[in-house]
Amino acid sequence: MLKIFNTLTSTKEIFTPIKKNRVNLYVCGVTVYDFCHIGHGRTFVVFDMIVRYLRFSGFQVKYVRNITDIDDKIISKSTKEKKKINTFTASMIKEMHKDFDLLGISVPDEEPRVTDYIDNIIRIITTLIKKKHAYIHKNGDVIFSIDSDPNYGTLSRQSLTSLESGSRIPLNNMKKNPLDFILWKSSNKEEYSWDSPWGKGRPGWHIECTAITNVFFNNSIDIHGGGSDLLFPHHENERSQSICFNNKSMINFWMHTGMVILNNKKMSKSLGNVYFLRNILKDCDAEVLRYFFLSTHYRHPIYYCEKNLDQAYTSLKYLYTALYDTNPFFNNEEGLNFELEFYNAMNDDFNTPAVFSIFFKIARKINFLKNKDILKTNKFAFRLKYLANNLGFLFQDPKEFLQKKTTLNLLTLKEIQLLIEKRNIARQSKLWQEADNIRKKLMSLDIILEDLPDKTIWRKNKKS
């Protein structure tokens, strides 16, 4: 019996699809103004895992992940690069697919682009105005009134009073409430504006998902997902306008992935600590990164550092070592008890850390049987590969994986630490040239040192 943590109720609930054996799943996709970063990777690997498991469990899944191909950042970036918006977004979507393919993220059933659904967006906004959930500003903007929804703040568990007290109202503010948000943004520039009853303009961010989910799911969604950074205001606003448009809640479960933490800080462009997937994957095997993403429960923050990446590599190396020199390609009933444990872990809100511990138990069994019982060894090897494949793992040839270099490429963790210790000794002895030479050697290998009062820490230079 599958249980999923529902953000709306803040509890684990038994998952019962709206239609028997069918799951409608929607995930907020990428705004394609730049390359995909590690936060995108974490979220979409998680939902790829969820879709794979639901299908493995016998559900027919309709998976839709949108693409935002019009917004202020896209306009700014395309202008800067002197490209037409359509040309720019097409190239960024292509790059997004390259990154996701490397990570083994399956293509969703539908990947709608916002600009293909402008008519649907206008229709919904028109209805919201008629129902007095939205108002038109004199400049042509259409704005959603959060005061028209008495349940606003329910999803993110925030009261209107506390939200309003934390907002600052600018002079000449065009909104009735500072938390009101744009549904339609007035714009007269031809390349990124469309005709509407309120004049030329383009859609606001939040209305996009409401329009697309209405088109593809006919007001009926089992699971809506995204990163926890989208919970407020994006998902709160989306839910509010969707309920006001449809006169009911159309989403049963809300799921959110935890943040990626870098050097004890949330990843953020403003902090200058955004790591692009393609830069990380230059010297990290894609399956290692995928394993890293799922080694922490999807709802929890995940701490990105070389040590944790190296740990993911070591874990995968152990599993591939168990599969090495086996023939796991025939079905059998050996190890079904492990499969039951696998189901129990996955049915507990997709508990992948527990699943990985089960994989290790099977691997230990294989290692124990090697050179003792070839037939049983191969049977358990099948069970390990069969279960792991269904989550997107262990597709590589074991020999090829084991011959690859580690995630650090040229240096092991131990070698790096030895060099740092040697440099510390040189500094204590005031051998500044020797210490500087070691720093330069590490820098040439993209190892960045940071001297603290009591120790020296290091990181791999994978910044954008």
Curated annotation (Swiss-Prot):
Domain of life: Bacteria
Any one GO CC term of the record: cytosol
Principal cellular location given in the protein's record: cytoplasm
Cofactor annotation remark: Binds 1 zinc ion per subunit.
GO biological process, one term: cysteinyl-tRNA aminoacylation
Locus of motif 'KMSKS' region: 266-270
Binding locations of ATP: K269
Transmembrane segments: none
Reaction it catalyzes: tRNA(Cys) + L-cysteine + ATP = L-cysteinyl-tRNA(Cys) + AMP + diphosphate
Listed cofactors: Zn(2+)
CDD domains per the UniProt record, alphabetical: Anticodon_Ia_Cys (cd07963), CysRS_core (cd00672)
Protein's name according to its UniProt entry: Cysteine--tRNA ligase
Organism the protein comes from: Buchnera aphidicola subsp. Acyrthosiphon pisum (strain 5A)
